[in-house]
């Protein structure tokens, strides 16, 4: 592996695997690195039943043992303990929570008819010009009728705030790159077609 990666995306996808006559959903965890030349490189695929901080700590140690000494920006989902797992091995890495994950989790609390208007209001947070303006937008949302109706949404953003705001330190081009782990979803799209089902988890990694 490269000694340093400017950006590494960490996420999981679910694929269908045939097992003893039945088809089961299996999590495949992916690390996708962006090299200094801008090219993307799959750093590893791991099959693990449960995504947890201990598992990701093992992944970080594996990347370190394979030659990577530093990650500048790690883009992750909102798993509790994930930032600690990364910084335990790469202490200088900036951990950025995927804004799209936070948004999706927020909308899960809403009735269907309320999702579009609330999503529009939440854009004021992650499209703010800087972290200070973003926090003002979050506070305004919490005080609004929507925020009062769905207090859990504001709590989701508050809990992950330290990992939400790092991308405000960068310009629009970099922000667009790191605010989501969709690069992994695009990479894995062929695995997620309705007809795709693998006979063994090893087939997925080939």
Predicted regions and their residues:
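RNase H-like nuclease fold core
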Residues: 1-76, 80, 84-85, 89-92, ...
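Hydrophobic alpha-helical scaffolding
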Residues: 46-49, 72, 76, 93, ...
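Amphipathic alpha-helical transducer elements in NTP-driven molecular machines
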Residues: 7, 25, 50-57, 76-83, ...
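Acidic/histidine-rich catalytic cores and adjacent linkers
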Residues: 127-206
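A detector of single, family-specific signature residues
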Residues: 36, 46-56, 61-65, 110-117, ...
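Conserved, well-folded catalytic cores of nucleic-acid-processing
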Residues: 34, 62-66, 88-92, 105, ...
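Short acidic, glycine/Ser/Thr-rich loop/turn "cap" segments at secondary-structure junctions
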Residues: 41-44, 68-70, 119-126, 138
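Conserved beta-strand -> loop -> alpha-helix junction used to position metal-binding or nucleic-acid-contacting
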Residues: 73-80, 85-123
């Amino acid at each position: 592996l490269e000694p340093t990666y400017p950006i590494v995306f960490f996420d999981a996808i679910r694929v269908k695997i045939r097992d003893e006559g039945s088809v089961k959903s299996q999590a495949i965890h992916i690390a996708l690195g962006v090299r200094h030349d801008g090219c993307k490189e799959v750093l590893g695929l791991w099959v693990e039943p449960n995504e947890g901080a201990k598992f990701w700590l093992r992944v970080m140690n594996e990347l370190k043992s394979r030659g990577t000494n530093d990650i500048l920006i790690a883009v992750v989902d909102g798993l509790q303990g994930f930032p600690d797992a990364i910084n335990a091995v790469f202490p200088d890495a900036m951990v950025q929570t995927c804004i799209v994950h936070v948004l999706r989790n927020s909308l899960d609390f809403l009735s269907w008819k309320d999702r579009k208007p609330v999503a529009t209001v939440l854009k004021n947070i992650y499209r703010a010009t800087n972290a200070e303006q973003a926090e003002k937008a979050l506070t305004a949302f919490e005080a609004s009728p929507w925020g009062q109706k769905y207090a859990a949404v504001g709590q989701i953003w508050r809990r992950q705030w330290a990992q939400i705001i790092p991308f405000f330190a960068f310009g629009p081009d970099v922000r667009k790159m790191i605010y989501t782990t969709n690069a992994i979803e695009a990479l894995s799209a062929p695995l997620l077609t309705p007809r795709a089902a693998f006979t063994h988890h090893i087939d997925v990694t080939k």
